[in-house]
Structures are given as structure tokens and as C-alpha cells.
């Protein structure tokens, strides 16, 4: 008697296998399709690409990639490339090319403000209390920063064994390493960097402009240098330090918070972290801001030590919330620019939390054929495998930690 069920199962399996192979071929095809951006579909955090053959891709970013000056304007690409220019007052500065948030740095330290952010007609500027040395700015573009990241990635790949660092730096690594999908989704000009070496004894400063934020890295060569990091804030604003050590910059007339400095993260060369406290003193002509860091941390630290506050306006939009939970820890390192996953320093178990606030919703009738979360390793990884689990309860990055949101609790995170 013929086993029709067996034949039917065999045919179904064959069709499934063929479909899987076809899907893999199509995936490879569209991964390497150059694609053309559909500019009319832009949103603040989203780009759309037409890949041909009636296939489209939406790339959702964690922060704005587009800006517009008013509601009715078309979305423009943010370009934070730093360009040399001269202000109306004759000061030679570096200014970002295209953004609703305007950032300026002196081409050479000149006793004036080290940095300024202008948005919605208001400008917030600051500098060290001590006069900085006349150090020249060293600016790098987003493309240069991306190439540096690709060089580090290439050095871990077998195909580049035997290549010198110099040859990697001069190579078109994006073409050699990334798919067309990765290349079209990477908006390099979103980021730029500017560094002043040794502006004060033992103190260097590095600024990274990222979308609609400025990250300030104050780099200490030794413990004594901390005393030189006192910041001079203008009396044009009122200030408040929150319980979470955030600095609120307020309009004097309305009391509205118009700029904000996130809780300053502090880390040493070995990756050990803590948070800095912020202390304000009214000096009459200006407001004095000091960073207070645990003396035990400073004594045990492997130098250099970096203090890295992030400054932005209150209009800054972030499309994701993320943070790291350290087992048994109360810390809330949500201002860090990375997640820790796995064992930190070989002992502390860490879990990352990540959620998108807004996703790209396709038109009715469209079929979603794939979704990818793109992340990259910063350091310390011994494995490329990361497990993802559904989070079952709401959380806020500024408030969540292991003690109030245990990820081992299956009512918080699925198992």
C-alpha cells in the first residue's frame, strides 16, 4: 500500500527547503542592492530606500538623522561636519555644517568659550575657570571616525591577516567589509569630533557632536588634574542640579529648562566606571561648576580617567531608551554611549535593556519580509552571540536598575 502521507510530507519538506534557499538568495541580492533613498518619505529618525523589484527598506535610527527648521519645511540631512568660519565678532571657529542645533568651537583656544550650543534662538556656552593654553583644535569628520572603527574591525578578521595598519587606513574598508545595506544605512556625517590636547596641565578635552547632542570628554592624566576641571557657566541662565546629578539650564524669565547636561559618567583606562556629582557655586559674575568624584575611585584608577557629560537642548529627540543592568547593582548608567552584555571585568554579570520609541510602519497591504537590529562591538567581547528576550513590563532608562527590575524575574523578561 502506497504511503501517500510520507510522500506528502517529503514534498512539503522539499518545498520548504526550496523556499528557504530562494529567500536566502533574495536576501543576499537585496543586501547588496545599492538602493535609492525615497526622500519624500523621510522622517526625523527614519530613511526609506527603494531597492527595486518592488522591495523597499526602512532604516530606523536611534537618534535624529534629519532636521527641519519649521513644521512645514522638508526634512534635510543632518551634517555635523565641522567647518572653519569666522563669526560676526571676528572669532575664528569651527561650526557644524547643517543642523537645527548649531555648535561652535574655537579653532584655537583663546580665553573665550570652549564650546557653545545654539538652538531656538538661545546660546549656551561654557569654558574652564582657569585660562586654557592656546591649543589648536584637531577636528575629524564622521568619515574619518568610521574608517577608524572599520580598521579596528578589520584587525579581528582572518581575511585581513598580514595587512599593516597603514594599509588598512588607506583602504576602502567600507567596500571590503560592509554590504550595500550596511553602507546605505550608515550616516557618517551625523558625527564629528574635535580635540584640544593639554589645554591645562594634565587635562585634555574632546568634543563629539552626535546628531543633536554634544558629548564632552574631559580627560585627566592624573588625580591632581581633577582640580583644574572647574567650569565657568554664564549668568545668562539659571541652573539646577537634580538628585540624579543632571544639570538643568533654565531661562531666567520663564524658568523653563532649555538645555540639559546628563549625569556625568566617569571611567578609567581599565573600563572601571562611576558617576560624578555636580556642585554649583554662585561667584557673582559667573556660576562655578565642579565635578565631585569618589576619592577611592580616583586613587585606584588606571589613568587616564575620562569625565563625559552629554549636553543637549530639551528638544533633543532620542528614538531609543537603553541602559545596562549590573547584577545586584543600583547604578543607572543610562547616559553611557554603549551597553554592557555578559561578564564585565570578568566578574559582574550585565544585561542590556533596549527599546524603540517609534518604528517605521509600512503602508497597508505591504508584507514585512525581514527585520534586523544592527549593533557593533566596542570592546572586550569574546563572543559574537547575543541572546535577545522580550521585555514584558514598561521601564524608563533614567530610573531602572537590577534591584527594581530583576531580568531573571520572568514577569519582567521572558525566558
Which residues fall in each region the model found?
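Residues that cap or anchor secondary-structure elements
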Residues: 2-314, 346-347
